[in-house]
Amino acid sequence: MYPFLILGIKIRDGLWPFTIIIVAITVYANALWGVFQFDDYNVIVFNPSVHSLKAWWQDAGSGIRQLLKLTYTLNWLAGPNSFGFHVFNMVCHAVNSFLIYYLTKRLTYNAVIAFITALFFAVHPIQTESVTYISGRSSSLMAVFYLGSLLAYTRVERSSGWGGRWGLFSALLFLLAILTKEVSLTLPFALVLWELCVSEKPICFMDMLKRQAFHWLIFIASLSVFFLFTRYTRLILFSMNLRSLKSNLLSQLNGITSTVSHYLLLNRLNIDPDLPVISRWSLTVGIEFLFLCVIVAAGIFSLVRLIRKKSETSEVLPQNQKVIPQPEIYPVIFSFSVFWFIIQLIPTSTLIPRIDIINERHFYLAGWVIFLLFSSCIVYVFAKIINNMKCMWVTVIVLAMLAGGFTIARNHIYRNEIALWEDTVKKSPNKARGYNNLGYAYFLAGRYDDAIRAYKKALEINPNHTLARNNLEMAYKASKRR
C-alpha cells in the first residue's frame, strides 16, 4: 500500500485507525433514521435563516456560529429531512475518532493505548448526544477542527520560528472551530499544555509563544469581536442573572460529578437531566470539592515534576544531544488528562451560568482523557501486572461490544420523539419540561388523552409552566373535536 498523507501522517497498512472508523460508522448506522428532536426544531426546522444560502448570508452578521449554520443550510438544501443531517454527524464522529487515535499515539508513543482510547471514544454511548442528536453537531463539528488544529500543530518543527505552514494550517483550523462553537477559544491553552507535556526539549516559553503567535492573535481578535455583537453581550448579561457565582460553581461541581458517573452507569444517559441548583455547602458537595482539589493538586505536582525532570535531564546531556529521552508515559498521561479536562470544561462550567447546568455533549472533547486514563490503566494492569496481553484484548473487545450495544440501543431511543421523552421522564421524573415535551410528542401523534395526562403532570410539578398550560388547552380542544 502506498503511503498517503493526512495532516502529515504517513500511513502504511494502518489497519487500526481505519478499524476505528468502521466501528464508529457501524455503531451509529441505526441513528441515520432518527428524527429531529428537542432543540432541532428551533435551531433548524423552524429557523428560516438556515433554509437557504441567501437567508444564511443575511444572518451572517449576527456573528454566532456561522460555519455551523452553514452546514445546517447545506444539509437542508440537500433535503429537509433528518437523514442527511445524521450522515454528516456520523462522519464528524468517525473523523474525530480517527484524530483521537493519532493524537493519543503522539502523546503516549504507544499504539495500543491509542487504539483502545479511540475505540472507546468511538463506541461509548455518552457520545450519542453529540452525534445522534442533530443539534449536538456544535460539539462534534467543532471537535473536528479543534483536534485537527492540535494535530497539525504537532507537526510544527521546533526550529520553525513562527510555525511554518503547519502552524498556519493549525491556526486556520482554529478559526474554523471558533466559527463553529465559541468554547473552542480554549485551544491556545491546550497547545501550551501539549508543549508542557509532550515536548522533547526543555520548554522555552518565548519560542513556544512564537510558534503559537497566530493562535493567540486569533484568540484575542475573536474575543474582541464577540463583545461587539449585541447577541453575545445580551446572552452573557442574561446568563449572569440566572444564579450567583457561588451557586453556579457548586451546581456545576455537582453536575460534573453526576455526568462523569455516566461513563460507567450507562443506563443513566439523559438528554434532559434534572440537576439541582445548589446554593449552599453540604457534605456531598464538600466531598466532591475535596476530591477535585486532590486531583488538581496531583495534576499540578505531576506536571511540575515532569517539567523539572526535563530541565534537569537537559543539563546533563552531551551538547550534541538535543533531544531529551522519552519520559515515562504515565506521568505524562496523568498530567495531560487533568488539565485537558479542566480546559475543556472551563467555558461551560465555571463563571457564566447556563439555563441547563450541564449536558452530556459538553463532555465530548473532555471525555477523551477519561478514555485515555481508562485505556492506560487497562494496558498497565494486563501488560505489567498480569502479563497477559491476550486476556487484555478479550477484555477490551467484550467491553467495547457492551458499550457499542448500549450506543445502538440509545440511538434507537432517538428514533421518534415519544420514545426519547418517555425515556427522559423516567430518568427525570421531577422535571416539568420533559413531561411538556412528551405531551407535545403525544399531541403530534394524535394521542390526545396521553398528551393531556403529560401536560397535567408538568403543571403538577411546576404550576407556573406557561407553555404546558397553553398546550393543555390546545390538547383539550383537539380531544373534543375528535
Feature map (PLM): residue ranges:
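Polytopic membrane enzymes that build or remodel cell-surface glycoconjugates and lipids
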Residues: 2-476, 480
